[in-house]
Structures are given as C-alpha cells and as structure tokens.
C-alpha cells in the first residue's frame, strides 16, 4: 500500500508549493506559521519545509487517522471541524490516504469504491467507523496563542466547509489557503460557489488558482477542485 500511495502522490497529486511560496507576503520565512489539516503522512508540509528551509516548529499537522505517526513535526491526532465534540470518522482501510473523512461522500460512492479496490487489488477491506475527538481551528489557535496563519492547507475529503465554519476568527488573519473542495457531481457547483462566496465576501480572499482533480471524477459520481486562495492586498 505504501508503494501505491507514493505513486499516487507523485503522479496524480498537484504540487502548488512554488506558487504558494511566490505569494507569501513576508521578507523572511523563519517565523511562518503553517497548518496542514488532513495531513496524512505530512508530505505537503515536508515539501514546503525543504523548499523554505525552515524549522519543524513552524508547522502544525492534524489528522484523525489513529494509525499515523509523524515524529518530525508538531502532529496532532485530532479532527478539525465546526465543534469540539466526539465525531464519527470513516477510515478507508483499503487505501487510507484517499476518502478517509468525517464526511461520508466517498464512503457512500459505490462506483468509486469498486474501481479503487480494483486499482489496489484489495477487495476484502472497506471503510471502518471510529470515534474521534474534534475541535475547531479557532480553539486550537486560541489555546496556542496563534494570532495568524501564513499557509492553511485543508484536504479532508468533503468535510472542508465545517472546518471553515469553525475558523470564523482566525480566517481574518490567514494569508494563503490551499483548499480541496469535494462533493457529488450533482451538488458540486453549489458547494463550490458557497465556499468561494464565504471566503471572498466575509474574509477578503481571491482565487489565485484552481485545478480540477480529474482522477477523482473517473468512474465515480464525485468531483473535486484544488483551489488556492490569497488575501486581497490593498496597496
């Protein structure tokens, strides 16, 4: 499974690190604060760290998957959502990096599950239910006295809106967001519009780049985009 994940990460996942770095509004990088929500093994953060040449302590990584261990970063086995409570987390046991979420969109898509099991040659395993602790981004930042976030990456397989709703305060002080927006093909346009309107109108973000994740839509009823948002700067 590790080899399959490495291939998927290398050839199917987009790397936006260069455009993110180019749009950082800071002269030096040593005091950057980077949040990686839905980090899985931490490759997004590790890639940024290597390019920015900064300390591991600049990073805060979160994932609800209890099987992960990321010793080289500040890693928290915690789900980020809109409330502090116990929630259901659905772990994809046949390919944990894809579809594991508080949301059931991927779990419930029969065609996605069948075709991805074909790709992984793993027909016996499925999604398993786990009770996990969740908290809000605002609560986390308050508890750690974090006043601003330079880079916020969110990849949570359909549960992204709840994270934004639990970040009402800190979003005013976030510079760049890399956000995966995922939903069914029938409902995607509505969700995409709602999230973009929220970030543009309430928090003064603009879309810097968007790219459809084509591999997700093949043989499934799902659709997703990776979107880079940056704050509108008044010169």
Descriptions of predicted regions:
Residues 1-235:
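Phosphate/nucleotide-binding beta-alpha loop and adjacent structural elements of enzyme active sites
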